[in-house]
Swiss-Prot record:
<dbReference type="InterPro" id="IPR020618">
    <property type="entry name" value="Adenyl_kinase_AK6"/>
</dbReference>
<keyword id="KW-0690">Ribosome biogenesis</keyword>
<feature type="binding site">
    <location>
        <position position="17"/>
    </location>
    <ligand>
        <name>ATP</name>
    </ligand>
</feature>
<feature type="binding site">
    <location>
        <position position="15"/>
    </location>
    <ligand>
        <name>ATP</name>
    </ligand>
</feature>
<feature type="binding site">
    <location>
        <position position="18"/>
    </location>
    <ligand>
        <name>ATP</name>
    </ligand>
</feature>
<feature type="binding site">
    <location>
        <position position="16"/>
    </location>
    <ligand>
        <name>ATP</name>
    </ligand>
</feature>
<feature type="region of interest" description="LID">
    <location>
        <begin position="108"/>
        <end position="118"/>
    </location>
</feature>
<feature type="binding site">
    <location>
        <position position="148"/>
    </location>
    <ligand>
        <name>ATP</name>
    </ligand>
</feature>
<dbReference type="GO" id="GO:0042274">
    <property type="term" value="P:ribosomal small subunit biogenesis"/>
</dbReference>
<keyword id="KW-0698">rRNA processing</keyword>
<feature type="binding site">
    <location>
        <position position="13"/>
    </location>
    <ligand>
        <name>ATP</name>
    </ligand>
</feature>
<comment type="subunit">
    <text>Monomer and homodimer. Interacts with small ribosomal subunit protein uS11. Not a structural component of 43S pre-ribosomes, but transiently interacts with them by binding to uS11. Interacts with COIL (via C-terminus).</text>
</comment>
<dbReference type="GO" id="GO:0005737">
    <property type="term" value="C:cytoplasm"/>
</dbReference>
<dbReference type="GO" id="GO:0005634">
    <property type="term" value="C:nucleus"/>
</dbReference>
<protein>
    <recommendedName>
        <fullName>Adenylate kinase isoenzyme 6</fullName>
        <ecNumber>2.7.4.3</ecNumber>
    </recommendedName>
</protein>
<dbReference type="GO" id="GO:0005654">
    <property type="term" value="C:nucleoplasm"/>
</dbReference>
<comment type="similarity">
    <text>Belongs to the adenylate kinase family. AK6 subfamily.</text>
</comment>
Amino acid sequence: MLLPNILLTGTPGVGKTTLGKELASRSGLKYINVGDLAREGQLYDGYDEEYDCPILDEDRVVDELENQMSEGGVIVDYHGCDFFPERWFHIVFVLKTDNSILYKRLENRGYNEKKLKDNIQCEIFQVLHEEALASYKEEIVHQLPSNKPEDLEDNINQILKWIEHWVKDHSS
């Protein structure tokens, strides 16, 4: 059976991982967190002193994921999307969180002041939404609110419904 590939993207702290893991457990799709994948495989290309974090080696990440993506049935979670091949994804969801809620979430993660400010600005200017629209066909890019627990449940149900329709439309 053909299964779709889904991209969950958005600023750090918007709830991609929570949504992705829950979605995978309810849909049977495979969940991949690109940050974890990079950590496990040391898929880095240096270190960013200013942000105090490793720099992702995007080419190696793409190489690492290629086979799984071509098989289908994968949920990918990452706070960027412009380096993934367009052909990989059947739908892209950009999660969006109110700035005050996002600020608290990132503060709880121990983000330093610069990282906090930059991520909040990223959300204000909808950088990830713009990046998704520039990287994929507009009709497959959707924004989802991610502020409260009810949003999580609504988003899961909406995406599960979409998966069901996609599978039906693509079965022989």
